[in-house]
Regions:
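Structured segments of extracytoplasmic/periplasmic soluble domains
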Residues: 9, 13, 51, 63, ...
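Short secondary-structure boundary/hinge segments and terminal tails
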Residues: 27-28, 45, 124-125, 142-143, ...
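Short, glycine-/small- and polar/acidic-enriched structural segments
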Residues: 1-109, 113-119, 132-141
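Conserved C-terminal helix/tail region of periplasmic/extracytoplasmic solute-binding proteins
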Residues: 227-251
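Helix N-cap / beta->alpha transition motif
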Residues: 51, 135, 150, 241-247
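Secondary-structure end/capping motifs
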Residues: 155-233
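Pocket-lining segment of extracytoplasmic ligand-binding domains
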Residues: 23, 94-95, 101-189
């Protein structure tokens, strides 16, 4: 399901949960009754992957880069990186692909010079002769993956939410403890080599957080980012967008 329609799908009752925290928080700020109940990562593994001919940031001027879309996490991270390396985004072309898999496909087919990717697509690209040019996922406070639920779901089906959270936390524990099996599953799921799956495993496990909570700094930082593009009340409490009462230790 396209990330952009997930908030409406959850309100309509077509799904019970979805994983994109940035999408969920953005929708909640816009007025939808959604809440973050679980966060997986300390930072996000977004990587700018390019052709081998790119040796310095300025080499990207006049080239095209694939991203999921405007105002998506890859877009925000890339804008922050451009600012860091002092490149104007107007000097670089963008291809909006609708998703990471499609961004990878655009890079692999040489429609673009670079793409903002996450594992396993960045590792898959490296195998095909591209290179990881820059980690961009640590430049902006943007929450990534976890669990978004509707407030109605939390209020009326708390047991289902609790069981889903517990199952996901158990899965993370299992992944940490079972490297060989996890790597094999990643390779089978994404049709990648064992070496690619190993690198993907290492990246994700290194970025898992320890308690399932979203740091207040990240939530506040993301609200500040949203304020750059639309009105967001200055007194909006970011902690009202989360409910971690069902995690171990409660609130």
């Amino acid at each position: 399901m396209n990330t952009g329609i997930q908030p409406q799908a959850i309100i309509a009752g077509n799904i019970n949960f979805f994983p994109s925290l940035s999408t969920g928080i953005s929708a909640a700020v816009a007025g939808l009754p959604l809440v973050v109940v679980l966060n997986f990562y300390e930072i996000t593994p977004w990587m700018l992957v390019t052709t081998k001919e790119i040796n310095k940031p300025q080499d990207l001027i006049g080239k095209k880069i694939a991203i999921s879309g405007i105002r998506t996490s890859p877009h925000y991270f890339l804008m922050a990186w451009f600012k860091k390396v002092e490149i104007s985004d107007k000097d670089v072309g963008f291809i909006m692909t609708g998703g990471t898999a499609s961004s990878f496909a655009s890079l692999a087919s040489q429609q673009v010079t670079g793409a903002v990717l996450t594992p396993p697509f960045d590792d898959k690209a490296v195998t095909r002769g591209f290179k990881k040019f820059a980690l961009v996922g640590d430049l902006v406070d943007i929450p990534t993956s976890g669990l978004i639920a509707s407030r109605q779901e939390v209020a009326n089906h708390r047991d289902r939410v609790q069981k889903t959270i517990d199952a996901l936390l158990d899965a993370v524990t299992w992944i940490r403890a079972n490297r060989v099996e996890s790597v094999r599953m990643i390779a089978d799921k994404f049709k990648i080599t064992s070496a690619e799956a190993e690198r993907t495993y290492e990246t994700y496990v290194s970025m898992f957080n320890k308690d399932g909570r979203l740091p207040p700094k990240v939530a506040r930082g993301y609200l500040d980012l949203l304020r750059q593009e639309r009105p967001v009340p200055a007194d909006l409490d970011s902690q009202k967008l989360v409910d971690f009462s069902m995690l171990p230790g409660g609130k």
